[in-house]
């Protein structure tokens, strides 16, 4: 389909293509990137800005939202915030947005994009809240286009042992993917200077003797999962970031 426009045009709207082959956002992005690479012999720099309409549960009218990530010399373009009073549906919106952008739950009538779904490679959901509404798929159940980095599983809150196990898996993958320097720079910024010895203990595989607080454990584990899983054109959805937010992590 990437190399032959006739085949693409003949099958692009077929149910099997839309519901299976291109269901995940990463698959749709790969198709369009392949078409561009075959034509131009280089990767295209993407603008993942998008507009959508969201109909919250029990709401009569849809809400129009715009997310601008276009590069600008004067205004930062990497962060957008959703602000509203308690009970207005912010958490539900982020949950639905994660599913719609990644293709995790297939079609979703609650969120309608203006035009095509944005070319996002991977959606990463983070929450330190025990009430977050994100899909909790992990491990073998997860799909490439979606990663959950929160404190819960489908069966409840993660234990300290489970958090540490997830951390070890992510850290091992960081080493394998040659991302250690990036990880070390980020964790060094997160930790206070008097706690930098934690880094040395992690590098020495001395986990049993690490004297980290529960907050440090959660923060380092989450940042490690992020570094492990992030890709180009990833979108990180952070619900209630003020919970457990460490000053150095801002």
Regions found by a protein language model. Name each.
Residues 4-73, 117-118, 130-217, 223-232:
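Extended helical coiled-coil dimerization/tether regions that scaffold
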Residues 57-110, 203-250:
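Switch/communication elements of ASCE P-loop NTPase nucleotide-binding domains
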Residues 80-82, 124-126, 149:
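Hydrophobic/aromatic beta-strand patches that form the interior of the parallel beta-sheet core
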Residues 103-137:
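Flexible phosphate/Mg2+-sensing switch loops adjacent to catalytic phosphate-binding sites
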